[in-house]
Amino acid sequence: MWVAVDAMSGDYGPEGIVEGAVLAVREFGLSVSLVGDEQELLDILLKFDYDTEKIRVIHSTEIIGMNDSPSIAVRAMEDSSVVKAVRLVADKECIGVFSPGNTGATMAAALLHLGRLPGVLRPPIAAPIPREEGPPVILLDAGANVDCKPEYLAQFAIMGEIYSRELFGVKNPKVGILSNGEEDKKGNTVSVKTFDLLKKIPFNFVGNVEGRDLYGSGRDVDVVVCDGFIGNIVLKATEGLAKSIFNVLRNSIRQSSLAQTGALLLKSTFTAVKKRLDYAEYGGALLLGVEGICMIGHGSSNALAVKNAVRVISECAKHQINERIRERLGEYKTILGDSN
């Protein structure tokens, strides 16, 4: 089972990405195609003990930057690492692809070379959000589609429910719509119409949920649906707040010798909390609804994130996520309609 990894598009160069690929091969027995500058990647690989039969390097000469126009770049830079990595999936050489680069470019390459699954109106980005207890809440759309129709959001709910159940083992995922109140008629026109659609689908729809419910502080919910404009703001705000809290805590500890002593006693607790809130534990966010499996990572993805991204991609293949999506959307086609 081969997974393609765009090794060149991260913020900090390819070394951490290569290390993550080596760890995935070593710990999970998977195979990885690293796409990027061949000589540079081979030089980095010399630093590690790895199975040469399970890691290969695919040469590419271009890198799509964070400031490049996605739609233009994926066509003009066909030898870029992200495009070549996606094409390995399109050519059936790999079961999925991970890129820590330009999100828009990864999406554009996936749509251009992989295409949508039959019946999918718009592919959403599904981001795992850590909460107080249990598996993460799946937030979608986390940035792929800033303007959505109710039919899009209803499909997002179905795809997110499958992701939560198959990958995180939630037996009967609770699905909610992110809104400005729990009452049935709260929200804008799109969310109210989406509410009516989701009531018709035979799954565990719990109605409207509020922002606090994402983190386990309010209503119990496993999948939260919104458009990509709101979802991306929520995702970035969540990441920023978590980082800020850790910084405040660290700075406060440094100001007092007593606090430093207490911190030493609580070191294992702090480590456990950090691990629970670390995005790297989930690898990245899946672009659901495309042929093949596509995961988008942070530009700052480290070796742990890459290792887990490769693992999650392989688990998606084992659990036949795309087959489940295809089946469920087919079942509910009369409810969801065919609005493009």
UniProtKB/Swiss-Prot annotation:
Record bears the keyword Magnesium: no
Query: GO annotations under biological process?
Result: fatty acid biosynthetic process; phospholipid biosynthetic process
> Per the UniProt record, which EC number(s) apply here?
2.3.1.274
Q: Name one GO molecular function term.
A: phosphate:acyl-[acyl carrier protein] acyltransferase activity
What Gene3D superfamilies does this protein's entry cite?
Isopropylmalate Dehydrogenase (3.40.718.10)
Alphabetically ordered keywords of this record: Cytoplasm, Lipid biosynthesis, Lipid metabolism, Phospholipid biosynthesis, Phospholipid metabolism, Transferase
Q: In which pathway does it act?
A: Lipid metabolism; phospholipid metabolism
SUPFAM superfamilies cross-referenced by the UniProt entry: Isocitrate/Isopropylmalate dehydrogenase-like
* A cellular component term, taken from the record's GO annotations: cytoplasm
| Protein location | Cytoplasm
Catalytic activities: a fatty acyl-[ACP] + phosphate = an acyl phosphate + holo-[ACP]
Please describe what this protein does.
Answer: Catalyzes the reversible formation of acyl-phosphate (acyl-PO(4)) from acyl-[acyl-carrier-protein] (acyl-ACP). This enzyme utilizes acyl-ACP as fatty acyl donor, but not acyl-CoA.
Q: How does it assemble?
A: Homodimer. Probably interacts with PlsY.
Q: List the PANTHER family.
A: FATTY ACID/PHOSPHOLIPID SYNTHESIS PROTEIN PLSX, PHOSPHATE ACYLTRANSFERASE
Q: Provide the family line.
A: Belongs to the PlsX family.
Kindly give the HAMAP family that the UniProt entry links to this protein. PlsX (MF_00019)
Spell out the protein name for this chain. Phosphate acyltransferase
Q: Which organism is it from?
A: Leptospira biflexa serovar Patoc (strain Patoc 1 / ATCC 23582 / Paris)
